[in-house]
Each structure stands twice: as structure tokens, then as C-alpha cells.
Amino acid sequence: MKFSSKINHRHCNQLFIGLLFASMLVFGSNIQAEPADFSLPDMEDKQQKLSDYRGKWVVVNYWATWCPTCLTEIPELVDFHEDHKDKDAVVLGVNFEDIGLEGLKRFSEEYFMNYPVLRTKPAASSALGIIPGLPTTYLVSPEGEIVARQVGPVTSKLIAEFINQQSTE
């Protein structure tokens, strides 16, 4: 019997998609109803608490400078924050890597990040739940409950539509 050394890309894609959906089923069930109230330093070393934003929707986005998908997502988060910060929602970007403070400041200026950027060390989970990959975004309701988690990129439109749907239910 001879095994082919050629990779069938269609089968690999099907396997990847199957594993992706399976991981979403496993990880998706770990959303907590009431999050722990985290407190993380921002780029000015001021502690930011999640509970300080009660009364607004909070988009908590875990990201890193080395993550290409995170970088393409940043303009979407900038747009969403700009459109909603004075109304009903804010974005908190949580940098999830070991990076110097000055490097992080330069990076956030270069990408015009208009929302608070908080700092934490990489770990398998956070106060909000598991971080299976980057970017990971949690959506916290005005009451402080985690209502959604997205592993992978989000768009301004997707976030706004989800909030509108939740607000009308």
C-alpha cells in the first residue's frame, strides 16, 4: 500500500472548518453571566475598572501587535468607538503581550487608537473567560453581564447590529 504525499487542500479546508466549529462549541459555553470586575493599567499607569463603564455597552477586545488579524480589526474598533463613545458604548482594547510601554504608546498612536488601551500579560484566560486565540472580543451589557464572545475579527457594523438586536429584545 502506498500513501500519497500530496495534500488534498479541499479535505484540509473541510477539516479546518470542522475543527473551528468544534472549538467554538467547546469555548462558547464558557461565557459567564456576571464578569469579575477586572482592573488593568492603561498606558498612563492609571487603573481602569470594567465596572466604571456600567450603564454602557463595553466591547473588550484582547489583541496583540504581532497579530495580523488584530491589526486589520483596529480601524473597525476605532470607528465603532468614535460613533458610540458619547452615546451607548465604548471599546476597551486589552493588549495581550509582553511589550514595553513606550512601544505600545507608539503603536497605538500609529494606528490612531482612540479608545483606552489596557495592559495585561498573556494567559489562557482572563477575568471575562477563556482567550482561545487573538483577537478575542467580549461584549458586556450595560448591566455588566457578558452577552457575547467572538474569537476572530469583528466589524463596527457587526457590533452595532448585535447591540441593536439585544436592546430590542
Can you name each region flagged by the protein language model?
Residues 106-113, 119-164:
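Thiol/disulfide oxidoreductase modules built on the thioredoxin-like
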Residues 26-50:
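N-terminal "domain-start" segment that seeds a small globular fold
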Residues 16-26:
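Bacterial N-terminal signal peptides
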Residues 50-68:
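Short active-site neighborhood of thiol/selenol oxidoreductases, capturing the structured segment around
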Residues 71-111, 121-125:
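Structural microenvironment flanking redox-active thiols in thiol-disulfide oxidoreductases
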Residues 1-11:
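N-terminal secretory signal peptides that target proteins for export/translocation
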Residues 35-36, 58, 134-135:
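Short loop/turn microsegments at loop-to-beta-strand junctions
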Residues 59-60, 91, 137:
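Hydrophobic beta-strand anchors of alpha/beta hydrolase catalytic cores
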